[in-house]
């Protein structure tokens, strides 16, 4: 037992190894700890419960459009503080912060490209840019995209992700509901195929306009889709809401959307719809 009396340690304490930030994510649905490189390889879909994480627009570009077929359109559009909106943080400062955070000019990107060889116009919203809110730039970009689809006689696809109209632009943001809906009416009159893809979340003015005006409405699994949020509705009516209320599975059951499509199957589903409906 002489080793109890040893004064000098013969063994060193193991060195603590630092783990780089950003290597792990926790699934908000099943609480599984996920290795980020593997998660991204799986299109940011949890391999345990199929929860679809929110992703950047570039993920949808790579996922949906044929390689090297895309052309980025309307890159010169930028938001302005028409109303000189004053809040805790000025609107102009919010725009600068969002641009720095996302590397984008606003909450939407528009491309023309091909899906399995078929030409399309594709719009993709970015929830990380001021909650994907619809202001003058989003409305103008969507309108121009529809006009291009009419001119080129190609389908128009729009990946929706938004908290609704951009309150910092007041009535100007609300005008975009009518503006985009009018353009979609023209598109339909010209026989165009419009497919919105509703992702988590799609709410507010986007749901009340182009989010629900599709010929075929697709949604990702588990996406929050509605006008007002569930918390607001619960407070207003004073009642508990049904399980899964405003999730894509609930909306499919009630007939508000047409198909729920996993991210990995989205391109082939859209390609099939285009071949059947054009």
Q: Model-derived features: where do they sit?
A:
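An N-cap/entry alpha-helix motif that binds or orients negatively charged groups
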Residues: 13, 25-26, 53-110
